[in-house]
Amino acid sequence: MDSDEGYNYEFDDEEEECSEDSGEEETADDTLELGEVELVDPVVAGGERDDCGETGGSGLGPGQDEEDYRFEVLTAEQILQHMVECIREVNEVIQNPATITRILLSHFNWDKEKLMERYFDGNLDKLFSECHVINPSKKSRTRLMNTRSSAQDMPCQICYLNYPNSYFTGLECGHKFCMQCWGDYLTTKIIEEGMGQTISCPAHSCDILVDDNTVMRLITDSKVKLKYQHLITNSFVECNRLLKWCPAPDCHHVVKVQYPDAKPVRCKCGRQFCFNCGENWHDPVKCKWLRKWIKKCDDDSETSNWIAANTKECPKCHVTIEKDGGCNHMVCRNQNCKAEFCWVCLGPWEPHGSAWYNCNRYNEDDAKAARDAQERSRAALQRYLFYCNRYMNHMQSLRFEHKLYAQVKQKMEEMQQHNMSWIEVQFLKKAVDVLCQCRSTLMFTYVFAFYLKKNNQSIIFENNQADLENATEVLSGYLERDISQDSLQDIKQKVQDKYRYCESRRRVLLQHVHEGYDKDLWEYIED
């Protein structure tokens, strides 16, 4: 390419008009067009609109400097420019139309080196065939179906309605259809099927892909164009290990890092998440165990544990039975079974006597094994509920703590009316920030503890956890109750002392956990 104009993404409105088709083959344009569509740069979650990439560091890891993990927040427009730059770099070597190069790069998951290697291995026909495009260096051997004059109507092979020849268009494969059918076909593929880079020619058994210029020329709805643009850019982001979409709803920003790692990044919308897994930042638990925990909470594994802990199987027909009374004399309600057995030992009821319960098989090995299995299930359920309840409690408290900002703002305004400067009252906002950080950390410590085997280091961890939890509750009490009762100086002294202590204990806890990671001190329970 001779100039940057060949990579212009803006769509020329004049190209929307149907041009006269003289019957000659359509030639590929060098311009890669993804539409003159307004890209949404939303303001969500209290974020500020900014047209420039935002850079920053996490600054949240224990003992880490903010420069340790650098990242940049990009808008959708900037992602498009990254795509353009990638295509430009490749086309400086292979000299193909930009739309064709985009399809080639998509086929190789935007791996420029891999594309270059295949491109110069000497078998271009095979490469273009695998990528489902016509080699632009060769003229199509299939003549477009223009045997009739432009004045004569011809039937569309999709809707079978007659239109002038000028109302038809097609790809290099030679298949032509009317403009209306093309538009409907592309809209269905994009909106209903969510297809972007893999839309093929609508002709039967034709796998030639539709290029970006054709899509943008034949679609008139700006919403469909925007959706197509998002699908193309999403493919670019998903294939790039240094890019990650912000997981916040309706946020169109992308975070770019210098190297991929399980580190915290913060989008301009305010969402902080783990770059590795995309979940909310979850220090100190690792991504592997958080995924297992989320799956455990979402699936029916604990329902199965409850069934195992609170029901038993009939020893004869194996139907599940729940005890609904105090008597241990059980009668199976299965009409084809009617077995009578003892709830305690699962043995036949007849040897137990008819006058009073007398379980003479209580110590039998098979009965003991059955009871042990039930006890294990009950213990597993109780253990899960112990950690899950505390995890959910801190999650709920964290939601409530966010409401404190409004209350604190009001108190800060009151303090400023009592001869305190704006800077002097910032300790309240800082305290709420620390409180929310501690809640989040404590929430994920229970996930970490659930999979942690007991040893000397785990005891130290639990002591640190208990200390931080106690300090966090005290700080929360100061902010929720004492903030409206005590004198201004008393409030400031108590709150500052406590949030600094919370910061210190949180740092100690995280440093201990990460030290355990570094020295391989932790042993885990494989669930």
From Swiss-Prot:
Pfam family, one: UBA_ARI1
Binding site for Zn(2+) 1: 156, 159, 178, 181
ZnF start-end (RING-type): 156-206, 314-345
Region (Disordered), start-end ranges: 1-66
Annotated binding of Zn(2+) 6, by residue: 342, 345, 352, 359
Known pathway: Protein modification; protein ubiquitination
Record-listed Zn(2+) 5 binding positions: 314, 317, 332, 337
Subcellular location: Cytoplasm; Nucleus
GO terms, molecular function: ubiquitin conjugating enzyme binding; ubiquitin protein ligase activity; ubiquitin-protein transferase activity; zinc ion binding
Active site: 327
Region described as UBA-like: spans on this chain: 75-123
Source taxon at top rank: Eukaryota
KW Cytoplasm (keyword) present: yes
CC terms in the record's Gene Ontology section: cytoplasm; Lewy body; nuclear body; nucleus; ubiquitin ligase complex
One biological process term in Gene Ontology: protein ubiquitination
Family according to the record: Belongs to the RBR family. Ariadne subfamily.
Name of the protein: E3 ubiquitin-protein ligase arih1
